[in-house]
A protein has these predicted regions:
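Solvent-exposed beta-strand sheet faces enriched in polar/charged residues
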Residues: 31, 38-40, 78, 88, ...
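Extended hydrophobic
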Residues: 147-211
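Conserved small/polar residues in nucleotide/adenosyl-binding loops
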Residues: 212-219
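All-alpha effector-binding/dimerization core of bacterial HTH-type transcriptional repressors
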Residues: 48-96, 121-124, 133
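Short, solvent-exposed recognition segments
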Residues: 97-174
């Protein structure tokens, strides 16, 4: 309860009423032994409702599945969520961990190939706004490696390169030994709405090879 009070800024009475209501609705459940709270199963229903309501996800699912079969590598579709990408569709390889199979995880735009492919399709003023606000984000729980790019000038250069190439890359920035290549999905106004990303091991792939294979799958 104290943690919820700290996060919400509400007093104890308000927090207790709020948690009681969420438990009654099924969005919160009591933790093991009746201690604390965990997300409730009802959240899964809302996730289902959302996924079913987005036509892009339905149309993209066969493509994502085909790309994964052709490359035998992880393929993901992520949506934009302000300063983050949030994984919506994920097709895995047998070597992936459980957490990497789950939709809903979010990562910063500035630190991912998918995010930078989105930024590459935005005007410069919007890119600068993303860079400025991202610099203020807490990064304590964000996956990173010694190779993660955090310098705004370097990120800006990577975005400009992605504009020229039509795709963005990230080498070992979220996970050592992993290479990511991504391209943005644009709407009818040529605004980015999502990104498709393919990930391979640096020991097995280089960027041109991964691009060739993903292009072949797309065809």
């Amino acid at each position: 309860m104290n943690e919820l009070m700290e996060i919400t800024g509400f007093d104890r009475s308000t927090t207790q009423r709020m948690t009681h209501t969420l438990v009654q609705l099924g969005y919160l459940e009591r933790g093991p032994g009746g201690k604390g709270y965990t997300p409730g199963k009802k959240i899964l229903q809302r996730s289902f409702d959302y996924m079913r309501s987005v036509p892009l996800l339905e149309r993209a699912t066969p493509l994502i599945a085909e790309m994964q079969r052709e490359t035998n590598e992880r393929v993901e579709l992520s949506l934009i969520s302000d300063l983050y990408i949030i994984f919506a569709l994920r097709r895995q390889t047998k070597r992936q961990t459980f957490s990497s199979t789950l939709a809903g995880r979010e990562l910063p735009l500035v630190q991912t190939a998918g995010g930078r492919s989105i930024m590459a399709n935005l005007p410069d003023d919007e890119v600068e706004d993303i860079l400025a606000r991202s610099a203020l984000m807490p990064m304590d729980n964000i996956p990173s490696t010694p190779k993660t790019n955090n310098d705004p000038d370097r990120i800006r250069a990577l975005v400009h390169r992605a504009r020229e190439d039509g795709y963005a890359t990230a080498v070992e920035e979220s996970l050592l030994g992993e290479l990511n290549v991504a391209t943005a999905i644009l709407d009818n106004r040529h605004r980015p709405v999502a990104t498709i990303q393919i990930a391979g091991l640096t020991s097995e792939w280089d960027t041109p090879c991964l691009l060739y294979t993903s292009d072949a799958a797309d065809e």
